[in-house]
Amino acid sequence: MADRPSWTGYLKVSLVTCPVTMMPATTGSETVRFHTINRRTGHRVVSRYVDAQSGAPVADDEQVLGYPRDDDHYVLLEDEELESVALDSTRTIDIESFVPAGSIGWVWYDAPHFLMPDDTIGVEAFAVIRAAMEAAGMVGIARLVLYRRERAVLLEPRGKGIVLWTLHDGNAVRNGGHPAARTRPASEAESADSPEMKLLTALIDRQTQPWDPEMVRDPVQERLLDIIAARQKGRKRAPAREAAKPKTGNVVSILDALRASLAQDGTS
C-alpha cells in the first residue's frame, strides 16, 4: 500500500510558490498495539468523557475547552474563539527567515516529515528552493498548523528532497543547557593525555563499526509477537526472562574497568 500524505498545501518563499505534500518520516504502524478487554465477557473496553463530580457521561456537544484559573474555576473558550487566533499557516508553509544549518541545537528538534512536490508543475520551483538552501548552507524557518496546533517548523534540504522538522516551543525547552555542565566539576581524567582517555579512546576504536538500522531494532516487539503467535496456536507462553545481572568482579577504578574491558576484546 502506498504511503498516504498527512498534509497537502503550498511551500512559499517570497513570491515563489509551489504545491507540496508531506508525510511523517517515521511510522508507528509496526508497533504492537493492544486494546483493553473485559476479561469476563471478552468484549473491548471503551472510554468516554464523564463529569468529574457527578460521574455522568458528557455528550460531545456539551464538551468545551477551559483554561484553569484555580482548582475549581475555568475560563471557557468556544470553538469560534479558538479559530479566531489561527493564522494563515493552515495551508501554506511561508518561509519567514533562513538561519545557518547546524546553528539550531538538537534539543529544539521534534518530529521529522518528508516534504515533496505535489504535482509536476511545482517540481522546478521546489527543486530551486531546495538547491538554493543547500548551496547557501541554510535552513528555512516557518510556521504551520499541524496536528491541530500551530507549530514552528524547520525546513532542511536533504538529498533530493526537503525534511520538515517540527520544533519545540520556546517555553518547552529548559534553559541553561545540560545540567551536568552546571553541576559537575572538570576532571583530570578528561585531559587528552590521561591514561583513562587513552584507554577509552582505544576501546572506542575497537568498538567502532558502520551504522546499521539493526542497531535500533526493538527486541521487545519481536518477543511480544512470539507470545501472541503462541497464544493464537494454543501454546503456553514462554517463561519470563530474567534480566542479566552485570558482572562486578573486583574492578575498583575507572582504569581497572577500562583495562578489563580491553582485555575482554583480546587486548591488554
From Swiss-Prot:
Residue ranges constituting the Ku domain according to the UniProt record: 13-175
Name of this protein: Non-homologous end joining protein Ku
InterPro entries membership: Ku70/Ku80_beta-barrel_dom, Prok_Ku, SPOC-like_C_dom_sf
Stated role: With LigD forms a non-homologous end joining (NHEJ) DNA repair enzyme, which repairs dsDNA breaks with reduced fidelity. Binds linear dsDNA with 5'- and 3'- overhangs but not closed circular dsDNA nor ssDNA. Recruits and stimulates the ligase activity of LigD.
Superkingdom as given in the UniProt entry: Bacteria
GO molecular function, one term: double-stranded DNA binding
One Pfam family matching this protein: Ku
Subunit architecture: Homodimer. Interacts with LigD.
Family: Belongs to the prokaryotic Ku family.
NCBIfam families: Ku_bact
Biological classification of the source: Bacteria, Pseudomonadati, Pseudomonadota, Alphaproteobacteria, Acetobacterales
Region annotation Disordered: where it falls in the sequence: 174-194
Name of the gene this protein is made from: ku
Organism this protein belongs to: Gluconacetobacter diazotrophicus (strain ATCC 49037 / DSM 5601 / CCUG 37298 / CIP 103539 / LMG 7603 / PAl5)
DNA repair keyword on record: yes
GO BP, sorted A to Z: DNA recombination; double-strand break repair via nonhomologous end joining
